[in-house]
From Swiss-Prot:
Alphabetical list of Pfam families matching this protein: HTH_1 (PF00126), LysR_substrate (PF03466)
Protein name: Uncharacterized HTH-type transcriptional regulator Rv2282c
Protein family: Belongs to the LysR transcriptional regulatory family.
Binding region for DNA: 25-45
Coiled coil: none
This protein's GO CC annotations: cytosol
UniProt record, GO biological process: regulation of DNA-templated transcription
Annotated HTH lysR-type domain residues: 8-65
PROSITE patterns linked to this entry: HTH_LYSR
Alphabetical list of InterPro entries matching this protein: LysR_subst-bd, Tscrpt_reg_HTH_LysR, WH-like_DNA-bd_sf, WH_DNA-bd_sf
Recorded GO MF terms: DNA-binding transcription factor activity; transcription cis-regulatory region binding
Keyword set, alphabetical order: DNA-binding, Transcription, Transcription regulation
Domain of life: Bacteria
Amino acid sequence: MPLSSRMPGLTCFEIFLAIAEAGSLGGAARELGLTQQAVSRRLASMEAQIGVRLAIRTTRGSQLTPAGIVVAEWAARLLEVADEIDAGLGSLRTEGRQRIRVVASQTIAEQLMPHWMLSLRAADMRRGGTVPEVILTATNSEHAIAAVRDGIADLGFIENPCPPTGLGSVVVARDELVVVVPPGHKWARRSRVVSARELAQTPLVTREPNSGIRDSLTAALRDTLGEDMQQAPPVLELSSAAAVRAAVLAGAGPAAMSRLAIADDLAFGRLLAVDIPALNLRRQLRAIWVGGRTPPAGAIRDLLSHITSRST
């Protein structure tokens, strides 16, 4: 029989469950990669549709009503079944496929994917299993998201500060941005610390717009200085970490780079890390796919299970 018009869609239940788990609209918004206003509107729409108050907004967050507690339990069960169905449909689509099209941001493609792929191959060979063929394309995070959405890639890896909406995702690794300069730079010689505001006002060597590293630095500066923070235009925009590194070594200016990409430079003193007090430059690296919270069954899920087991 058809569902009642009072029955919300799965997205509404997913947002409401995120509110219940986070305890606030803001926490749910951060978890889902939405604005707090969008989450608030969706909750109000859901309450109007079903005709029941689900949560009470307080100064300390969002408190579920008795009805909201019951609906949250139902939502968890419903989404668990939906994830199983979604994963099963994905299994039907990918059954027998031994080729995985992967698109990854450059830092992940260069610094992490080779190790993950080699260790997966070794593990599969030890078990006597079939080794899937991984076709890897390196790009920036924005293009990786678009490739997964458009079906060009089966799996993506990104560095963005927030998970993209409408895609499943899981954290697969953690990284840290490091502001670096060559040994002769003025920041390397002075005793006074560099502030977050001074960093924001300094022209930097950067990656191209919408790259994960550039977006992560901007997000960290806004968290520290406020949403109205003004950032100086870059002195150079380059399309690869290698080009950024070379420009910094040549004296073009400071840059924020992945610690994964410059570990040797820091160890041997070719580049020096600049401490920026109160600026949180730690970040999460994510895998993304089309579908729900559970990745598609088969080779894709096996690859992600292998990666996450190594990162824990």
